[in-house]
Amino acid sequence: QAQRAEAFRKQRATSLSSPAGPRSASSSSAFPDTLPAGTEYGADNGIRLEAVWLTHDPAYPDEQPTAPLARYTYTASGELRAVYDRSGTQVRGFTYDAEHAGRMVAHHYAGRPESRYRYDDTGRVTEQVNPEGLDYRFEYGERRVIITDSLNRREVLYTEGEGGLKRVVKKEHADGSITRSEYDEAGRLKAQTDAAGRRTEYSLHMASGAVTAVTGPDGRTVRYGYNSQRQVTSVTYPDGLRSSREYDEKGRLTAETSRSGETTRYSYDDPASELPTGIQDATGSTKQMAWSRYGQLLAFTDCSGYTTRYEYDRYGQQIAVHREEGISTYSSYNPRGQLVSQKDAQGREIRYEYSAAGDLTATISPDGKRSTIAYDKRGRPVSVTEGGLTRSMGYDAAGRITVLTNENGSQSTFRYDPV
């Protein structure tokens, strides 16, 4: 594994040293292969996480990947510039202010337009520009923030408290309505009032902060009980009915009793696992499950005794489902982890294609018929073609559909009020 890692590092160093290649702080040869043993303080030593490698897989001991699971590049100042997935595809990118270290001025996802940010002299965001979408302006006042979008809709947030205890206590919505929130001295929510003036109160445990009761606008109260591990053990409803939960000494759920008195029980074969292997409902019917070491469902047996089995690849992707009577389906994925094929036991296959942004663009049925979906830059579907017929959609800046043209050419338009 070390040899594979070193080969990859040399390849990266070569690409980074080329005139066309981006410079990166991660190209330094003086960096460790493991994290420090503890927390360290002081000047930034310039070390950054460059890649995450799979070094041991019990299920595939002789087949380790030759590329990292994730890779990161940085600016010369050590700011995160790009994130790459295990296929080598850049999935996120960042741009920073040259005069203010660490201040992000742009960000984008793979195949999506770049969002940009502007700041005031104190480092607060004053504008967010989203191509093909809504832009936002932010104005800061004494204990309030005004947010205005490019459709001129305005919201105002009023705050109380300082530092980590600052909370939004009042919100003026674009339609003129007002909602309020109240908090205790520890910053925990204790009451909310909606736009119609209806108030909901939350009673909190003094030490744990757990919600012990919720009183609605009509004065009716739901109460909650807990055990010493802060797990919910009972819920008492306004009509006096009660539901309950029981746990074992490891904190695993062993029984649930509904407000109607019906009890569902859970059993565990592995003392170290939190995943149940048996579920018995109020009628006595039992379902059984088997799990992999990674928490993946391997088999499920229903109340009738029928068993469905599941298989996974090394990345945790489901590659096969085997049902009773030999009914099986098989799935395959591309290097980015996207489903590209589903095949049944008779060999009939459905194939899938994707854009660089990860949007599903085509579905090819077993008979070769092709259905396609086209998207705009924000990932919204603008046309769907199936069987030679096309349905198209148009949107406004807020992402709301404004026109729908059906397969027969009939068109519907939609208009919205200012908010």
How should these model regions be labeled?
Residues Q1-V419:
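Extended charged/polar low-complexity repeat regions
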